[in-house]
Structure formats: C-alpha cells, structure tokens
C-alpha cells in the first residue's frame, strides 16, 4: 500500500495513462514498456526514493495484471418502462 503523497500522485498519473493507452488500442506489452520507461525515468531523476520506486513498480504491475481495470463497463438495461 502506498502512503507517500508523491508516490501516490505518480501512481494515479501512471494508472490513468495506462487506461488511456488501453482505450486507444495499445495492448499489455505496450503498457509494460510504458511502465518500464516511466519507472526508469523516476529512477534516473531521483524524483522519489528508490524504495518508493520499487513499491510503485509492485503496485503498478499488480494493476496491469488485474484485467478488470481495463474492462469497459456495460450499461445496465433499464427495466420497468414497458
């Protein structure tokens, strides 16, 4: 569980970008490459502590592997009108 505010902001930006890329037609290999690049940039710039980057990587990988994050919600049919 992420507790550092900067790390949480990075997680939110990252997961929003992953969902947006998925909706544009990118697949899991592309998402993984994006995640790897994002994490490499964080490590290179020392924006957050290395152990926080590792935690962020674990959480983001868990997010990618949960396919329910990328499913489009189906609207519920409205009943009772007929």
Label each residue range with its predicted role.
Residues 36-43:
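Amphipathic alpha-helical segments that form the core helices of the histone-fold
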């Amino acid at each position: 569980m992420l507790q550092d505010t900067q790390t949480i902001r990075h997680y939110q930006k990252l997961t929003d970008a992953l969902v947006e890329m998925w909706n544009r037609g990118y697949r899991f290999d592309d998402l993984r490459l994006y995640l790897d690049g994002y994490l490499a940039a964080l490590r290179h710039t020392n924006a957050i502590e290395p152990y926080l980057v590792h935690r962020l990587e674990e959480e983001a990988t868990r997010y990618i592997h949960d396919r329910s994050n990328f499913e489009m919600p189906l609207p519920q049919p409205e009943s009772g009108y007929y």
